[in-house]
Amino acid sequence: MALELLLAMPLVAEVRSLTILHTNDLHARVTALDDGRGGFAALAAVIRKQRAQCSDCVLLNAGDLVQGSPISTVFHGLPVFEIANLFGFDAATLGNHDFDYGWIEARKFIDTANYPIVSGNLVGAGGRLFTPKPYVILRVNGLRVAVIGAMTEELRTLSTPKLMEEWHAVSVIEAARKYAAALHDRTDLVVLLGHINEVEEDRFLSQATEIPVLVTGHIHGGLEHEVSRNGRVLVRVRGYGEELGRLELAVDTEKKAPVSWTWKRLPVDGREIEPAGDVAVQVNRWEDEVSKQVDQPVAVSLRHFESSEIKRLIEQAMRDETGADFAFINQGGVRDVLPKGQLLVRHIWNIMPFDNRVVFGKFKGRDLPPVVLGDQKVDPEREYTLAVSDFTAANQSADEQLRSSGLRFSGDGGLLRDVLVDWFRKKKVIE
């Protein structure tokens, strides 16, 4: 009887410390950016320095580990996961770009990772989960910390349908709240590790009172300061490995929530910290595999180009190289900036890492949406050729005007990044 009474009694409330180190949207940027920031070897060094300073650390990644560098493009992402195993992640979730090579490759990523990859709302037929588990329970500093993975509900519109097949994301907040409720008596804290958009972030902060900590990715710009609401906190750092987040929590085990926290964004710069040698060896090994293919000069840029300007350059290249009257690419398809100076094939691949192909459609002027026309005037009855990527043609999700227009495309104008390389080589100078 005494034992039964003891087991029935609530545990004495304690406040214990927990430090969450976190990354998101690394996008295969294994080498440093042109300004010296980032790079997997420097990021690993920052992570290891931080872990050496605390005994209550966990390391999380909020998705989109691949897609964004030649190593990822050529080898379909697998080497990136192999290198990332050296970071020492305790848990991760998948991002939409982790499916850019198809769901079968994404499964290989899960098998390759030496840490659990979780998602609670990524499902197929009959609701079966894509990942082995929807969550993982980490034990650190006497705390039982549940980490629930989550994918943005926009997944289908952000991916090529044929690469996803049956897999899709169901309501992110309903799935996460379901698992949080089931975990309530088994854990001291629930953390959402989500690759979600800003609307979904806001919905969690407003509605999901049972999930007090959110570590997110998908929006590359990161946050200047943590977002807090009613005792809950959300954090997200800049992508491409430019920053490591450090969230220090004081967790009340009875309330199952933090009573205080501090958050820091730690810069990653190989000029200020000695890069991790073992990671550098692996990065260099794979870089040597692709260097001959991508470290070839294509043109000279007389100034720095931002992504909005590059969108216009890409559309011009598509028109010039294919003879189309109009071209359109969604802004989200531009993945990098162009620096001033010598441009290499690598730079072109970085702005367009996808295996997207150019396709065409012939349409009357009256059927072309304003997003394609801009300020150009057309004859409503004349037929015009419009070039787009096959990604845009497949779901036309990049723009509401295209989606509502119902335009249909066909043909094959080649890989878009090859079209761009040819165009830059012919231009020689970009200004």
Q: Where do the protein language model's features map onto the residues?
A:
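Bacterial N-terminal signal peptides
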Residues: 1-10
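Extreme N-terminus of proteins, especially the signal/transit-peptide cleavage junction
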Residues: 11-16, 290, 294
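Acidic, metal/ion-coordinating pockets
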Residues: 12-278, 307-317, 321, 327-329, ...
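Solvent-exposed loop/linker segments at secondary-structure transitions
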Residues: 24-29, 67-70, 200-206, 213, ...
